[in-house]
Curated annotation (Swiss-Prot):
Ranges for region SNAG domain: 1-20
The protein, known as: Insulinoma-associated protein 1b
Gene field: insm1b
Gene3D superfamilies, alphabetized: Classic Zinc Finger
Zinc finger (C2H2-type): 252-274, 321-343, 383-406, 412-435
Length: 453
């Protein structure tokens, strides 16, 4: 903002205390002639401005230089004619008009507000002409604070314009922050070692000999070059079909189901499905069961005459796993294994009861004494499961069997073997796998016989 920007430029401007800032710090400060006139001569009359103007240069030359800078009153334009604005007039007539305006106290407002220096007492003179800075923190205020340290303490505040040292400090701090932004843009290590991509880039061989630059006409334009192995191609299609030798596919294979993953986190979450929750086993299961004699196992054939196929690791055609005992379907192989363990526990329990009843036939009731074999033999007094047709020795075993294995499900028995399934697709898959020849014969028998022509 230029100097004197907010000064009102009317004809009857009130006198304002003003201190002009100089550019050179060590140079002497020009003195205000109005203050010298107020100190050395009586109050001038408004009718003699010419005598004041004539006495102005002699008074400035003969007056002694005070210790502290005199206070400048009035409009600064009336004292200094060489201001920074290029449009300001600098003629003597202009100075004369401003001196007349500044010394003319004919107005009652200005006469009451600012009396002449001759009418002031010594105390009023010290109070009125005390050194006051209107601009805090400038170079003049610093010099006046050192010169008049006995009157008032120096006011130290931040400068309005930053110094050269502060500017240099800002530039150096900005230049020091630039390497941090450059360091954030380095993502090469993350790309080459990221496990989520499933790829790994091997380190390239160090070529001590530079590649010879072929100056022939068959040299490609350099647009289709593999950035890893530096092989050049004539068209983008060849570059797209190129399999770089530095790119290696990383595979993480599940040891239980041989499923392949490209990320180790996915493999870890997949392996949690293979670990079923450990349920609280009953007290009877905690006790070690007695081994079933091999003679009884040989005497008791399987409940199915046809051999059952083993469990397929990949599951069925629609991605489900079927239980060969009851025909239930499961989405995961771990669920099927857990379900089969329940079958085995129940079968071991029934075999144990049969073994104990065979050892002590006198303790058994008469109805159970006639049917020592609960699973494979089918005497008239054995209880048959209505869902799967399994033979059970007593009612308690039948109720336990129904509670554990059957939840009011519809049974689909096989026509060729005693196996029973609880879904029509399960029975169809069983017939296609275990009885393909019998199924073909049935189809042929159901076809109508054509008469020969």
């Amino acid at each position: 903002m230029p100097k004197g920007f907010l000064v009102k430029r009317n004809k009857k401007a009130a006198l304002v205390s003003y201190r002009i800032r100089t550019d050179e710090d060590g140079g002497p400060t020009p003195e205000c002639p109005i203050a010298q006139i107020a100190l050395s001569s009586p109050a001038p009359s408004a009718s003699k401005p010419d005598s004041i103007l004539l006495a102005f240069p002699s008074a400035g030359a003969e007056a002694p230089v005070p210790v502290h800078k005199p206070v400048q009153f009035g409009n600064p334009e009336a004292v200094y004619q060489a201001l920074y604005s290029p449009t300001r007039p600098v003629s003597k007539d202009h100075d004369r008009k401003y001196f007349e305006r500044s010394l003319n106290l004919g107005s009652p407002i200005s006469a009451e507000s600012f009396p002449t220096p001759a009418s002031l007492t010594s105390l009023d003179h010290h109070l009125l002409f005390a050194p006051v800075d209107l601009k805090i923190g400038t170079s003049n205020s610093n010099r006046s604070g050192t010169a008049s340290g006995a009157h008032a303490p120096a006011i130290q505040t931040g400068a309005k314009r930053p110094s050269a040292d502060a500017a240099e400090r800002k530039v150096s701090s900005k230049s020091a922050k630039k390497p941090k932004a450059i360091r954030k843009l380095n993502f090469e290590d993350e790309v080459t070692t990221s496990p989520v991509l499933g790829l790994k880039i091997k380190e390239g061989p160090v070529d001590l000999k530079p590649r010879p630059s072929s100056g022939g006409t068959n040299k490609p334009l350099g647009e289709f070059i593999c950035q890893l192995c530096k092989e050049e191609y004539s068209d983008p299609f060849s570059l797209a079909q190129h399999k770089c030798s530095r790119i290696v596919r990383v595979e993480y294979r599940c040891p239980e189901c041989e499923k392949v993953f490209s990320c180790p986190a996915n493999l870890a979450s997949h392996r949690r499905w293979h670990k079923p929750r450990v349920q609280s086993a009953p007290k009877q299961a905690l006790q070690p069961a007695k081994p079933f004699p091999e003679e009884l196992r040989a005497e008791f054939p399987s409940d199915r005459d046809t051999p059952s196929p083993g469990l397929s690791e990949s599951g069925s055609e629609d991605g489900l796993y079927d239980c060969q005992h009851c025909g239930k379907r499961f989405k995961r192989q771990a669920y099927l294994r857990k379900h089969i363990l329940g079958h085995q526990a129940l079968q071991n329990q029934i075999l144990g009861e049969a073994f104990r009843s065979a050892e002590s036939p006198d303790a058994m009731p008469s109805e159970d004494r006639q049917s020592p074999a609960p699973l494979n033999l089918s005497p008239a007094d054995c209880l048959t499961c209505p869902a799967c047709g399994e033979k059970l020795p007593n009612r308690a075993s039948l109720e336990r069997h129904l509670r554990l294995l059957h939840d009011d499900a519809q049974a689909f028995p096989c026509k060729f073997c005693p196996a029973t399934f609880y879904s029509s697709p399960g029975l169809t898959r069983h017939i296609n796998k275990c009885h393909p020849t019998e199924n073909r014969q049935v189809i042929l028998l159901q076809m109508p016989v054509r008469n020969a022509c």
